[in-house]
Design a protein with these regions (language model features):
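Short, flexible domain-boundary/linker segments around small modular repeats
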Residues: 1-24, 49-76, 112-114
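Secondary-structure edge/capping motif, primarily at the C-terminal ends of alpha-helices
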Residues: 18-21, 43-47, 69, 92-99
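Extracellular/lumenal glycan-associated surfaces
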Residues: 24-45, 77-94
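Amphipathic alpha-helical binding modules
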Residues: 76-116
Length: 116
């Protein structure tokens, strides 16, 4: 993955998060954030238990955001999400910068397999 591609993916994930926190997020934004966290989890499992913990905390917050959306019809972030999702996004963006394209593609494919 070239620098430009990884930068685009990182900005897309961060913009999705921003829109979700301001109430302007869509289902596509939510799916992008959730998929980014799934890829981050696959990579974290290959790296370090602390990284796994960071991603799992974020995923718990992301699930709570989805539950809120199902209740009120609008995305938003609570204090837990505001605290736990940004570190996962930082980790994901670092993965994009420092992992090979093949490693990230493999992580994406593994996350898809786990969802099926």
């Amino acid at each position: 993955m070239c620098i430009e591609e990884s930068a685009i993916l990182a900005v897309e994930a961060r913009m999705a998060w921003h829109k979700l926190t301001t109430g302007d997020g869509t289902r596509d934004d939510f799916d992008l954030l959730a998929n980014s966290s799934n890829v981050a989890l696959i990579r974290a499992e290959q790296i370090d238990a602390l990284a796994v913990e960071v991603v799992l905390r974020a995923q718990t917050a992301i699930i709570a955001m989805k539950e809120r959306y199902q209740r009120v019809g609008r995305f938003g972030a609570d204090a837990v999400a505001l605290a736990d999702v940004p570190p996962m996004l930082d980790f994901y963006c670092d993965l994009l910068s420092f992992s090979s394209p093949q490693i990230m593609t493999d992580a994406l494919l593994e996350s898809i397999n786990r969802m099926n």
